[in-house]
């Protein structure tokens, strides 16, 4: 079983036990070592069955544990203007979070999000008039 998950602005193919590097500026990835993060699934493959679509994936969760932090490769930025002697060199290393995938599967019943039931417009109007009548 494996899943394609979104993390840090990229998509990663993960299986249980894999360690992935995600952008530490992403939501949840700045957590301390040992914290649990949930990665949104884009696609889940379990043998011959492939699960896609937002409604089908709403019941599936991919959780991981932050096992460490690292820095990405050095990127050198150079600004140069001709004939003026202006040169400026700057470097950058992106902070990364190392996340070990611990679970791919159905979401626990307590974690499922249920949409609140909406009252019809007529029922809402009746409640408003009843409240006004009792207030008078």
UniProtKB/Swiss-Prot annotation:
The keyword rRNA-binding applies. Residues 107-136 are annotated as: Disordered. GO terms for biological process: translation. GO terms for molecular function: rRNA binding; structural constituent of ribosome. InterPro entries: bL21-like, bL21-like_sf, Ribosomal_bL21. Keywords: Ribonucleoprotein, Ribosomal protein, RNA-binding, rRNA-binding. Pfam families: Ribosomal_L21p. It comes from the Bacteria. One of its GO terms (cellular component) is ribonucleoprotein complex. The keyword Ribonucleoprotein applies. Residues 121-136 have a biased composition (Low complexity). This protein binds to 23S rRNA in the presence of protein L20. Part of the 50S ribosomal subunit. Contacts protein L20. Belongs to the bacterial ribosomal protein bL21 family. This is Large ribosomal subunit protein bL21. It comes from Acidothermus cellulolyticus (strain ATCC 43068 / DSM 8971 / 11B).
